[in-house]
């Protein structure tokens, strides 16, 4: 089974709003709605939304949106939630959904603040992931100004690791290929890697991108599929 996890637990401090970032509306619908729909239309049978900051408000926004479209029953059958009580990083957020992930199949991981992500983009990456038999497939982008994004670091063999902005050296910060925050994982590989992620970094957080290097050391990973993150 193909599943999806939507990261929607953060406050979104750069929005300068008390509302959770993912419930801010684009064309009359909360941003997180578009991530859920992209995952659904790309073939994900079940979706787990990770909530944290004002969790009830996020859940209500999602339910109200689908109810207004006459799709409340479909939403209830497809969408579930996992609570991240403390904001300890994206790796910790995904780990909060361990029961949902399970050990079989693949799981797509998306951010809840990417309203322009399309099912076509996800389908292309999913096909690559399955055709190549990858433990994880990373969607990346080339940006003229990569400031603030995690960098895709390569060696002579290809992808080596992903380094967050605050942990990057001056040389690594000059890299223009960035992590979009969108991935497809084999479920068992993801759970194994999450158990090994540490928080010895500038933020003191458990980073989901750290699973890439762990999986890379164990099984095959493809070159990142490039895509511009919103």
Please provide the spans of the model-predicted regions:
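N-terminal nucleotide-binding beta1-loop-alpha1 segment
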Residues: 1-17
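Structural beta-sheet core signal
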Residues: 4-6, 49, 109, 136-139
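A short, conserved beta-strand element in the Rossmann-like catalytic core
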Residues: 14, 115-116
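A short, conserved alpha-helix in the catalytic core of glycosyltransferases
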Residues: 204-217
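Single conserved hydrophobic/aromatic residue that forms the stacking wall/gate
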Residues: 219-230
